[in-house]
């Protein structure tokens, strides 16, 4: 934790209020923040939550040492999470894990633009845990602070747009739902054409 060690007291202080019940595996927090001219992401939850997800996604006995466990946590994080700003995917640089009863994953964020117009966040690290709730806080210089929840209801994903200095949540429709709506529209048009043809034939 050499890189993020100097920032840990700040993050620990912020998260202490957000996740006082962090020993519950269905609760987690994600923060996007700035420190020392750089942008970072931090995810915090109970160690048991990380353990449950790793054992579910891989298998029991997938790791034998803390280092192997940390590597799997980082791999799982990179598979299950993403951040898109102004349409560009942000890279997670040098992710690290601080193990404890309350375990934290840190990553530096690459090339966050100065003028942020939109943001899409997904954090499904704990998506396999029943009733999983992730509290998200965005606190970056030059933009309003935003706080919201990621749950199974929004598929652990949120889309936001900055309008007149205020964050607006955008409805994120699932591709299957979009396909279903499109299919219904096309079917309705097709049926309408058939009825119209039938009407002409009748007269």
Locations of regions flagged by a protein language model:
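N-terminal soluble domains immediately following signal/targeting peptides that reside
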Residues: 21-188, 194-201
């Amino acid at each position: 934790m050499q890189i993020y060690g100097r920032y840990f007291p700040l993050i620990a202080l912020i998260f202490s209020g957000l996740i006082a019940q962090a020993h519950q595996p269905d609760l987690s927090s994600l923060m996007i923040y700035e420190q020392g001219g750089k942008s970072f992401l931090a995810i915090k939850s109970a160690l048991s939550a990380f353990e449950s997800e790793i054992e579910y996604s891989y298998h029991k006995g997938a790791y034998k040492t803390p280092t192997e466990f940390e590597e799997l946590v980082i791999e799982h994080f990179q598979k299950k999470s993403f951040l898109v700003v102004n349409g560009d995917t942000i890279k997670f640089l040098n992710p690290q894990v601080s193990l404890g009863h309350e375990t934290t994953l840190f990553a530096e964020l690459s090339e966050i633009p100065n003028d942020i117009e939109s943001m899409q966040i997904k954090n499904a690290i704990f998506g396999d845990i029943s009733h999983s709730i992730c509290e998200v806080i965005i606190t970056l210089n030059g933009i309003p602070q935003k706080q919201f929840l990621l749950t199974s209801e929004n598929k652990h994903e949120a889309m936001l747009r900055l309008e007149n200095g205020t964050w607006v949540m955008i409805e994120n429709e699932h591709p299957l739902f979009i396909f279903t709506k499109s299919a219904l529209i096309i079917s309705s048009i097709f049926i309408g054409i058939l009825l119209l043809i039938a009407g002409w034939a009748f007269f």
